[in-house]
Amino acid sequence: IIVVDDGSNDNTSDILLKNENLYNHLYSNKSNKGKGSAVRLGLENCSGDYVVFQDADLEYDPNDLIKFEKVFLEFDADGIIGSRFNYDKYTRSHSVMNKIGNYFLTFIFNILYNTTFTDIYSCYFAFKRNLINHKNLKIDGFAQHAEILSKAVKSGSKFYEVPINYNGRNVSEGKKIRFYHFFPVLLQILFGRFK
């Protein structure tokens, strides 16, 4: 387990230092460089056969990781996406604009990559580590997830979706996604298909 503290300015570092038994490696950025940078740092330093990202805000339930493990073991999956729209027990209501944007991006992705996902931007994606070379990632912003997913789908052949529970935040609670993030994601989906 790798933990990346991306320049937290609360007591995250103190909590992490007091709980060193919960992870194998800790990497800390002195300043906040964004999720994409944290993901890249994690990928640069990970080992093992599989990778999954767990955001510390707990929008995604870590107990759902057991579902990912079962699918990897039973079907030798190359990658697994958690779907907030096929939820197991609960999902918090989404902003209607975010949901419409996600449906559109998912629809375009499915056409271009010949997949049948329901929720490409849940960002709860587990995959075989050999599908992604961190040195080939060019994006650090929100579109990085689309870059990772498109590269993985082009490199692998067996992808699954599992229902996940979701307790998303709204803007007042710290949600950072905005309408303008839609455009770089769409461009990455389009250009990523033909690179």
Question: What label would you give each PLM region?
Answer:
Residues 1-8, 27-29:
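Short beta-strand/loop segment that forms part of the nucleotide-sugar
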